[in-house]
Design a protein with these regions (language model features):
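Alpha-helix termini
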Residues: 24-30, 58-69, 176
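Catalytic donor-sugar/metal-binding loop of nucleotide-sugar-dependent glycosyltransferases
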Residues: 161, 173-180
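Glycine-rich, basic loop-to-helix element that forms the pyrophosphate-binding segment
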Residues: 41-64
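Acidic donor-binding loop at a coil-to-helix junction in glycosyltransferase catalytic cores
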Residues: 161-168
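Conserved donor NDP-sugar-binding/catalytic core segment of glycosyltransferases
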Residues: 84-117
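Acidic donor-binding/catalytic loop of UDP-sugar-dependent glycosyltransferases
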Residues: 66-69, 75-92
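Acidic donor-binding segment of Leloir-type glycosyltransferases
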Residues: 1-44
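A recurrent flexible, glycine/aromatic-enriched loop bordering the glycosyltransferase active site
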Residues: 126-146
């Protein structure tokens, strides 16, 4: 999902259009099919949560239409991964009784960007949950979510909150069987 609030600057809209054109060039190869959605979001609801919901809902609908369960993977435009990322996710689902999970992540540590305090805060959050004895410790980064499409539909999909949507979504599924 390539998205921007409806009242975005012309520069942002042009950047999105260029991204859309680039993705069209790589879509539908023999190994992967990509459905691209380029959409303006209502200003009041615009945010990564709504974009994530649109993408997940569309992918789940596509799998249902094919009468096939598939793997949904969240990934943000500013993320990076290695060449084996998708294969590792596929193998995890193939080799385990997996319905959903949180993928490992690591931000590139640029000393100038302030990412170190952010990364430490993320770790502090899960360490605090662990220390408190919370039964289901998990990170709440939306870009790290993966879920089986049938499981996604069964549990009502992503919500439309403008902030914290990944937190609330994960809390619905984290205690269900097959979460890793």
């Amino acid at each position: 999902v390539i998205n921007a609030p409806e009242q975005s600057s012309l520069d942002d809209l042009n950047l999105n259009q260029r991204a859309y054109e680039e993705i069209k060039h790589i879509k539908d190869t023999d190994q992967i099919t990509i459905q691209v959605v380029n959409i303006g979001l209502p200003q009041k609801k615009a945010g990564v949560g709504l974009a994530r919901k649109i993408g997940l809902d569309e992918a789940a609908r596509w799998f249902k239409k094919l009468n096939h369960s598939g793997i949904l993977v969240c990934f943000d435009g500013d993320c990076r991964c290695n060449d084996t990322y998708l294969a590792a996710i596929y193998n995890a689902y193939k080799n385990q009784n997996l319905n959903a999970g949180i993928l490992a992540y690591e931000h590139p540590l640029d000393l100038e960007s302030g990412i170190i305090p952010y990364e430490l805060g993320l770790r502090y959050y899960t360490d605090g949950l662990r220390y408190s004895g919370y039964p289901s410790v998990h990170q709440t980064l939306g870009s790290c979510i993966t879920i089986n499409s049938d499981h996604y539909c069964k549990h009502g999909g992503m919500n439309t909150k403008k902030a914290g949507e990944d937190f609330y979504f994960l809390n619905k599924i984290v205690r269900k069987p097959g979460f890793a």
